[in-house]
């Protein structure tokens, strides 16, 4: 999972820079302001979640394949794809139906953050090899 998340974070960074530049230069004069705003939001959310993917990859090297960390990694990976991908499609095509898909990606991102919270709460227990009740 570590290698996969590192690759995804790198691909998302590559795509984010490319889309940001494409939007700022090639599309600025061609798209209405609302659609440009959708593209900018998509790029922003890609970049917000690259550090999260890297953090989960780092956690994976420390504690291995624990449930919260696995859920966080895949939720972030899919959430970025669905959330930002639907906004990019909305921006490029103008098809409003893509906007209906965006909340699904948002929920996946929220699940990822919640799972990362769970991984942080249980982190001390995992590192000692015994799961204990957190915050006790």
Which residues are covered by each model-predicted region?
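Polytopic transmembrane helical bundles with strong interfacial aromatic enrichment
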Residues: 1-136
């Amino acid at each position: 999972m570590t290698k996969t998340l590192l690759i995804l974070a790198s691909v998302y960074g590559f795509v984010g820079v490319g889309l940001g530049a494409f939007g700022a230069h090639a599309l600025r004069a061609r798209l209405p302001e609302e659609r440009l705003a959708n593209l900018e939001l998509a790029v922003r959310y890609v970049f917000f979640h690259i550090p999260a993917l890297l953090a989960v990859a780092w956690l994976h090297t420390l504690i291995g394949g624990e449930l919260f960390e696995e859920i966080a990694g895949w939720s972030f990976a899919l959430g970025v794809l669905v959330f930002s991908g639907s906004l990019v499609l909305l921006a490029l095509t103008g098809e409003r139906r893509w906007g209906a898909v965006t909340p699904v990606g948002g929920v996946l991102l929220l699940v990822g953050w919640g799972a990362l919270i769970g991984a942080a709460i249980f982190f001390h227990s995992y590192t000692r090899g015994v799961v204990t009740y957190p915050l006790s």
